[in-house]
């Protein structure tokens, strides 16, 4: 029950946070971590698949961080509304 509540809360934050890129990226990382915990607790993943999943997740986080840094360097803020200008 707690996992489904966390999933719905993560989806709500991800869908409603469209003003700041940092909040969107953090909620996306929360959803991926929740998906990982669901797959591990349901014994759906073997250990090697778990490490591959975590490696891809770390790469996704690094790419999101690099996009955030380049956005802040170019516009001075992490607000998504500056992308339209």
UniProtKB/Swiss-Prot annotation:
Q: EC number(s) of the enzyme?
A: 7.1.1.2
Q: What class of enzyme is it?
A: translocase
Question: What reaction(s) does this enzyme catalyze?
Answer: a ubiquinone + NADH + 5 H(+)(in) = a ubiquinol + NAD(+) + 4 H(+)(out)
Whether Transport counts among this entry's keywords is yes
| GO MF assignments | NADH dehydrogenase (ubiquinone) activity
Q: Which family does it belong to?
A: Belongs to the complex I subunit 4L family.
Q: What is its main location?
A: mitochondrion
What InterPro entries does this protein map onto?
Answer: NUOK/Mnh_C1-like
Q: Where in the cell is it found?
A: Mitochondrion membrane
Which keywords are on file for this protein? Electron transport, Membrane, Mitochondrion, NAD, Respiratory chain, Translocase, Transmembrane, Transmembrane helix, Transport, Ubiquinone
Tell me one Pfam family matched here.
Oxidored_q2
Q: Give the source lineage, highest ranks first.
A: Eukaryota, Metazoa, Ecdysozoa, Arthropoda, Crustacea
Name used for this protein in its record: NADH-ubiquinone oxidoreductase chain 4L
What domain of life does the native source organism fall in? Answer: Eukaryota
A GO cellular component annotated for this chain's UniProt record is: mitochondrial membrane
Question: What membrane topology is given?
Answer: Multi-pass membrane protein
